[in-house]
Structure formats: structure tokens, C-alpha cells
Amino acid sequence: MLILLLQYNVSNPCLTNLLENKTGTGVGLNFPLKPARLTLAQQRKRSELKKARLALRGMGIGDFNRELRFYSTSAYTKTHWNNKDRINKWMQYDIFVDRDFESFLSHLFSDNRILFEYTYALLVKVRKGNKFYTIGDRQIGVLFVDIHDPFLLEVFDTIIDRLAILFEEYPTELEYTCDALLLEFHPVRPEKIKISNLKDAKEKLAPKTFATGMSVFNLIGGFDLRKVSTPINLNKKRYYSTQVDRLNGFITDNPRLLEFKQKFNEQLFMASPKKKLKYEFCDTSVVFILVKRGREYIVIEDVKDGEFHKRIFNKTASLLLHLIDKSNGDGTWTRINGNFNTLYNLENEIIMSTKAIGLRAIPKFLYNKKNEEEMSVLANPNLGTIDLETTTGAQPKCYAIGFYTNLDSKPIKFYIDKNLDSCQLVHTCIQEMMRYKYRNVLFYAHNLGKFDAVFLLKELLRFNLTTEGLNNPYEFPAPLTRNSDILKLTIKRTVDGKTRKVTIMDSFALLPRSLRDLCKDYNIDNPKSYFPYLFSVDSHLFYTGATPNINYYLDIPKAEYLKLVKDDWDFKDETLEYLNLDLISLHQVLVKVNKAINFLFDIEFTSCATVSSLANKIFLSKFYDDKNKAIPLVKDIDLFNDIHEAYYGGRVEVFNPIIMADSTKSYYYYDVNSLYPFASINDIPGLKCTFYEVVKANVNIHELFGFFYCKIKSPDNLYLGLLPKRTETSLIFPGGAWEGWYFSEELKFAVAHGYEVEIIKGYNFDRVSNVFNEFVQEVYKVKCNPNNVTEKNIAKLILNSLIGRFGMNINKIKTSLVPSEKHNELLTTRVVKSTTDLGSGMFMDIYVPGIDKNICEDFNLDYIEVLNSTNTDEKGTMPDNNVSITTAAAVLSYARIHMAQIMLFILENNGTLYYTDTDSIVTDLKLPEEMVHQTEIGKLKLEHTITQGYFIADKTYAIVNTEGEIIKRAKGVKSSKLTLEDYEKMYNKEVVEATKTSSKRNYKDGFVTISDSTVKLNPTSYTKRSRVISKDKWIGTEIIRLDKLNSKLSTHTPKSLSGDKTK
């Protein structure tokens, strides 16, 4: 066999040209260059330094902020590095495509941040859009002796090699190109690395140096190889520069062939001395020299055991790519490329492609040792409350403010002076809260995000413009937000030469009910009182006289008003007393809840910002088995986005709009006991995931378990749709034909009832059983058998708040309070979701942290320059470690299946459906006893026996039960202001006026206005099913057929599942 061999040329022309320019001015270097020839002492020093270089394993495709891991041969210890030490060097992709080594050096050392004789862990990443791919499966340990170090060229060539392989593995995602390359240099301080079995580790991990590789493997021959300019793509035969014809076998007496074999195996052994690898050449071996973009590769093809193998090596015998083609014996063959498998027919047409996807488990929540030492058997007593009162009118202002903690016998309160200076009022209160005695207190405001934060920020920012404030301003680091609502506000300022801070949380995010309802729920001794809000205007702040008229009060029963009437009513005194009660009652609620949660679950209530995060922490710390019943942690953006399309909410539909008053017939309103907890005890997707893309194969849905994009066709004459679909405004359950993402179990349920399903692509998982069983059983037991009303309410809250947390969006956004200069930078470099003018030259911006190429180009900014700018921050925001869209989507699917089974049972037993809302059903069929139970999870509880009812639209209905009670619901307006006759008018297509309460936040001027307005309710607004009209009367509904409807996908996602409701 004839073999073409490659002579590796050390004298790269780019490097030679650079070295000849000793001043470095030609390539933008601002330091003198040393002579090209090294002294013996310098060479010895380089050798010593190279021996100290560490190679670091880890890192594959995924997120772009992770900890570094240092491994020994037997164990590893994680070392967390401060990202402030990281040096980011962004480079144009064209530098590597054109093998422009000179530009590579110029960019690398242009700002003198990369130091010589210093060890770094180098991680190379490709950016395509807003997604990062790590190049290769390991970091590179680098230590540059000086500008002449040949190892620089090896790093450059290694990046080109890894680019080639990356583009092969992700051809669809990257399309053989990218936007930019990021070189992350993480300084490695050997004195801070603690590795067990260090001696063996150094031997194993020590990188081979450029010089060593060059001397051991110098391929023989001096051939003029043709330079080609094509995309970096190894797996294309038409790109081969030279093909070597196969003779009678590889093993011949040709000395060049024997020397190649010897040198190749020597280098292969050198590359992995522990594994002692040796390549076994056979009679079928064929060797190619492949030139790509001026980069030389060795390609060896073999046929072994009926399998065709193609391996691609670089010039130092490092394996870059291994393809295997094998026959399946049934007229098909499979190509294996790492974790990619492609099935072909004999015509070389793709039948199906699969790709194994590795998923990590959500980690079990564990207290670290420091936290365990600090934990007490008692609940955290350092709780405080803060509240403020505001005037009404066009521009409300804060006129009273106070706080309460367990450190004081009574609340500390402040009232506005006669100059009506709200700025000084708020400043005085916050300064008092910054006293040393309150340093460990975590304060809560009920509805902070929608109310209190607006006034607090405005007045403190106004204070920053005063002489005192300019010298010592307030700061507001990294507020925690949700949908532009501030959930956590930290206020910092220097007091007596020391930095003090006050942290305020939104208690409504943890206990999503009004304070008045919370006082009732938890049997509070000092319940919330009533106050004449409409009387709170500037001119009344120092009023004394008779009690204001009842019309100044909102929603106060007359009996309660009469208790408040007196002749010597003082506005200031009444305000402070009202404020006093609010502070104490909220504090009592928080203390009760905190103690109960600590008693039941050994969890600190104060460690969580929302009720869903609290439920998640309880589950992960007390009930989760991450070894045997692991939940997949979904951080990959493509996987998340696809499965999120299958994340549908509950069904809310009107089937029949009216129940006529009839004393001879009964109707029933049923609720399912804890629907979502019940649904969660089914099997959920595990860690083993395979992506399927079906081209010609027929796939049986009953053999799959996961999420799939399908063509759907429903049966004709369908009354009850079984599969959901999003429209621009809502979620419907249509008939007809369409395509969409669905959970396999919901597809199987639909197929069993006549649907036709054709799978196009999707993700198949293994099954995991009993993941939530213990959690549901134990918490549900507390709910059904509580020691007190507090435990019952907490158990109910925790049960209903867990699953939604797993469905949180991983596309994390960041909220910052920034001055106008930073605000302008964000607007021109990032995707800004929301911006709020706070006044005083400050803005609250909610944005995607990563710099966006399209935004930069819109504003005529150089993308690479922006990335390399020291004024920009590209760290990003890491997704949470407890997000699993697969779990959330599967549980909601099981819940819809359960509800559909009940509705199908009613229809099959000649019952009539009237209305359903997520976990409730209204029907005229009395369900059998085996389906009904007051407390058993998953069974139905009879809430009402109905004598009359009107069902106008989703969440808009009125029913009358056998006790004569009228239960009214009206979406978006005050149902208390509507009468039963109003619902009857809407049924008869009459427009009805209703009262809507609106809240408008004005951060710039620092106030919130809450007002009632009159709106008209459209009686024909229901569009989730087609209205059936007979003799001008609405008599029922039928499903919408998508072959008659041009519907579009929307961003409609499940709501009210996480427990994080807004007021």
C-alpha cells in the first residue's frame, strides 16, 4: 500500500513573520519581543514550567458558567473559583477559518491581561446566537513562557481541530459557522488546589508539550499538499485532497510503511500512557492525508468484523472523529458517530436519526456544615414587618410608615410633618431600621412589589439628590423580581463608617392572600381593621372631628362601620393605630407560619422568596431521592424550548350555558381532591433521554415515553376534545387536523379514543416511579389530620405549589437598578424586556444578560468590540438547579387525562357536562360512590348541589345551591357587585356593566393609584368552543375544528400552578 506522509513544519510563516517584527508594532503588541532563539537556561526554565502545567477534564456542550473541577486518579475535589479572575478574550471566527495565526496572537496579547509564566485553564467556546457550545470535552492547561513559545501555535491548531469536530457533531445547530469564539482563561493557583493522590494526578494529567509531540511524531515525507478552502467539515469524502489506493495489505516490507506504523503507535502510546493504546492496522486499512483550510489530518479506514470504521487523527495521533457503519441484516444500515445514530435504507436514504442526550439529576438540597451548626431547633425569630400608608388622589404620597420586630415591645411608627415631606419621613424610618440591633432582621411588606417598593424607591432616590444623599447615597443591589414586581429589595448605606443594609421581602409571594383573609385563616388575635382610604388626602392629614362617612370606606359591612363611629375622631391617631394593627397582625401571621413550617419540615421559612421555592426546598431536602428516583435537570435551551411547547395548562370550558331553575332535578358541582399532587404520583421522565427524528420509519407511540412533535387527526363528530392546542389568546381542545408537541401518555390516551397520531420527532425517556409519593402522602396526611388550622393551611399551600416550580423558564433574566449611562448601554447591547424610569436619573431594567449580536448591529456597534469591552459584563445568569420542564409538563398532562376520563365517564353514562375549570366539573349526573370521597386524594368531592346556574365564559359563572347561597365568579371584575340577574342578562346576550379595580404604578413620580372604573362585559366573548344557537337562544357548545380555523401558536402558559399568584 502507498501512503502519503506529512512533514510537520515548525516554522509557521505567520509565526516567523511575527517573530521577525521584534517591536510587535505590526500586530498591535505594545511590548518588545525577545530574540527568537532561546538560551539553554531559558529552555530549561520552559521545560520546568511546562511540567507544572495542569490539564483539566470536564466541560461539554451546555451553559457557559460552571465550576472548574480538578481530578486525581482516584477522587476529585471541587474548587470554586472567583469569576472575577476570569479573563475573556473574544475573537472573530474568520481568524480560525483563514488560519490567521498573526491575528490570533494580536488579539490574545493586545491588552496585556494574559501573563507569561502563569498557569491558566483555557476553555474555548463557540457562540451561535445566544447559545454557547464548549469546544471539546476538556479544558486546556496553558502556560506561555513568552511570545516565542511554540505552544501558542499548538493551542491555535487545537482550536481549529476542535472546531472541525464540533461542526460535525452539530451540523444543524451551527450550520458550519458561528458568530464568535470565546477564550476563557481561568487563573490556576496550584497552592489553592487540593487533590488527593497528587503524585499520580500530576502524572496522569500533565499535558504533552508542543516540543515533545513534535520530536516523537514527525511524519516522514515532503509532499506538496494542495491547499483547499472549504468549510471545516471532516466527514465529507469529496473534500479529501489525496486518496491512497489499497494494495494487497498494509503490512509490507516497505520501510516507509513500517516506519509510519511504528511512529504512529509511539505517538498514540505517548498520548495516553495509562491506557497503553495501540492501533492494530489490518489488511483492509486505507490511509488518507486530508487537508482542510491548510490543516493536515490523517484518515484511516478499516473493515473489521463486518463494520466499516473511519478514524480521523491530527498530526500528533490524537483521535478527533470515529465513524462506524454497520449492517443491521434487514436491508438497513446504521452510522454511529459518538452519541449520534443514523439509520439508512439501501438507497442511502435516512430512515431515522437518534441522539443520546446526557442529563444530570436535580441535586438533593443539603445544608452545608456551616448552616447545620447555625441551625436551631427553634424557628428563626428575626422577623420584622414594614408598612406604609399613602394618600389618595392624582399623585399619592407616603404620609405614615412604621416597622415591627420581636426586639421591640411595640411597633416603631413615623408620621409626616406639616411640611408634608415624604422624602424625609421615609429616610428617617429606614435609618432607624439600619440600627445595629436590627442587623439580623429580615423585614416583610405585604404586596411589596405592587405597592410599597414604588414609594420607598422614589423617596430614597429623591434623598440621594440632596446634599446629604450625594455625599452618602442609598444603594439598591440586585433586586429580586418576578414579572417586574420586586420580591426582594435590599437597601444599603454607610452608617457610622460601616455599611449597613435593610432587606425587605414580599410576604404576598409566600402567602398569596389578602392580609384580612390571612388573619382569618390563621386565627390572629389582632385582625386587620378598616380605614377610610378615600378620606386620605393632603388636606385631611391633621383632621379631627366626627368619623368620616361610610362612603369613604371600601367594602366595609355596616355593622363594622357602626363600631367605629365617634365624635372625637383624629386622623393621625387613627392612622397610627391602623398602621399598628397591620404591622402586628402580619407579624403574628408570619411567626405562626414560620414556627409551623419549622416544626413540620425543619425548614426556615425566611430562606425562600416565594411559596413555590419553599415547597421545592421542602421536597428536595426531606423527600427527594436523587440516587434512585432522580428528576432530570433540564438546562439545555433547545430541549427546554421543545418540551415547553408540550407544557399546557388545565381545561376551562363551557359546555352548556344554563341550568334552569327546576325543583324536580339536581345538578352537581364536583372538585377533585388535590388534582396536581395526585397527578404527580404517576411515572415521570428520568435521566436517560434520546432524541428521535423520524423521516421514513413508522414508530409505535405505545413503545415510547416522552415528548413528541406529531401530526394529529381527531375522529369526526367529536364532542369532547382530548388534546390541547394554544391559540393567540387561550387554550382550546379542538377537533380536526394539526401538529404539535405532546406528552406520550396523553397521545396514547387520545389514540385509545380514535385519534390518529404520526410522530415526526421528539425525546424518549426512561420511566421513574414513585418520585413524589412520599412527599404527597406525608403532606396530604397533615392536610387531612392537622393539629391546628395553621398546619392545615400550610399543608394545602405546599401541596399545590410544588409542581409549578419545576416548569420555571430557564431563560433567566436579570433586574438591575442602573443610572442613565448604564441604562443606555443595556439598551444598545442587550435584549431589554422591560424598563422603568425611576426618576432621579435611575432606571429599573429587566434584560437578558448576554450581549445580543442583532441589537449591537442595530445600533451600529462592533459585536466583538462590545464583547471585549471592559465596560460590559457577559457572565450571564445561571438557570436554577431545580428546574425540570419534563416533570412539570408530564404532571399537568396526567392531570388533564384524569379530568378527561371523568368527563368521558359522565358522557358515556348519559350525563351532561355544563362547565369545567381545571379540577372542577358541573354535571347533572350523580357520580357513583366509588368515585366520590370528601378527603381521598384524586377522588371527587361534592362541593355544591345546584338548583340554578349560568355559565357565561371561563371563570365567569353564577350558581345557586340547595341552601339558597349564590356563588358568583367574574374574571377581571368585582363579582360582588354583580347580581344573579346580571348573569341572566349576559346569557340573554345583554351587555352588563361591572366594576373593575385597576392599579397603576408610576415609579418615576413614586406613587401607585388604585381606582375603580365601570366596564362593559361582552356576553358573547366566549371563544374556546363554538356557541350553538337555536331560535336565537344559546343552548350549548361544540368543539372548534382546526381545519376550519387558522389558529396560531401563542405564549400562553399554565398559570396559578406555582402558588406565586399576584394580588
UniProtKB/Swiss-Prot annotation:
Assigned keywords, A-Z: DNA replication, DNA-binding, DNA-directed DNA polymerase, Mitochondrion, Nucleotidyltransferase, Plasmid, Transferase
GO CC field: mitochondrion
Keyword Lipid biosynthesis: no
Pfam families cross-referenced by the UniProt entry: DNA_pol_B_2
Localisation per UniProt entry: Mitochondrion
Lineage: superkingdom: Eukaryota
Gene Ontology BP terms: DNA replication
Class of this enzyme: transferase
Keyword Ubl conjugation assigned: no
Gene3D superfamilies: Helix hairpin bin (1.10.287.690), Palm domain of DNA polymerase (3.90.1600.10), Ribonuclease H-like superfamily/Ribonuclease H (3.30.420.10)
Reaction equations catalysed: DNA(n) + a 2'-deoxyribonucleoside 5'-triphosphate = DNA(n+1) + diphosphate
GO MF term list: DNA binding; DNA-directed DNA polymerase activity; nucleotide binding
Family annotation (SUPFAM superfamilies): DNA/RNA polymerases (SSF56672), Ribonuclease H-like (SSF53098)
PROSITE patterns named in the record: DNA_POLYMERASE_B
Similarity field: Belongs to the DNA polymerase type-B family.
Miscellaneous note of the record: This DNA polymerase requires a protein as a primer.
Protein name: Probable DNA polymerase
Organism: Claviceps purpurea
